[in-house]
Amino acid sequence: YTLLLGLLAALSLVSCDKQEIETYHANRSLFFERWKQTSATARERIDTVGYSFSHYVGETELTHEFQIKLIGALLEEDTEYRVSVVDSLTTATGDQYSLPEKLMFHKGMASDVLPVTLKKAPSLKDKQVYLTLRLVANENFGLGYTGYSDVKIRFNDQEVIPLWWTQEVTD
């Protein structure tokens, strides 16, 4: 019995060996968060966000913040990323919106925001316009999930029923 106990103790000392733990080493990628929490238990995929300046009396600019998610290790310093306007899917003119001059994903964050400023214009009384933005790979980031690199904003200055308006409000 003593011999068996001694043998087990010796084996346990031999089996203890330090090993390096593998960490995630893939290139970093970005994608737009497309899911919105609609209730405590439900989420909904959002492809287009909508604004009407008629719902924001007195406002001449509105800012929407798109959530951008990081795939890969957190950044150790603020890092530049790129976004382009998809001309073929955009009807808004350059004077109807603005983007930050330099787009930076902040260090230590797994999620950041892309602020897009919409500008009220007289032409928005007659029509709604679309702005489609696309993440673009650069030397710092690749593209994340397929189907999550574009976002779209629809905006106007027309009197429209708000999304939250239901038959209950009318009754």
Per-segment meaning from a language model:
Residues 12-15:
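C-terminal motif of bacterial Sec signal peptides marking the signal peptidase cleavage site
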Residues 142-171:
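Ser/Thr/Gly/Pro-rich, low-complexity flexible regions
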Residues 129-142:
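Internal, hydrophobic beta-strand segments that form the core of beta-sheet-rich folds
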Residues 122-130:
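Short glycine/proline/serine/threonine-rich loop/turn segments at secondary-structure transition edges
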Residues 1-3:
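Bacterial N-terminal signal peptides that target proteins for export
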Residues 17-92, 162-171:
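Acidic/polar, low-complexity intrinsically disordered N-terminal segments immediately downstream
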Residues 106-109, 114-122:
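Short, hydrophobic beta-strand segments
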Residues 88-104, 110:
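Short beta-strand and strand-turn-strand segments in soluble, beta-rich domains
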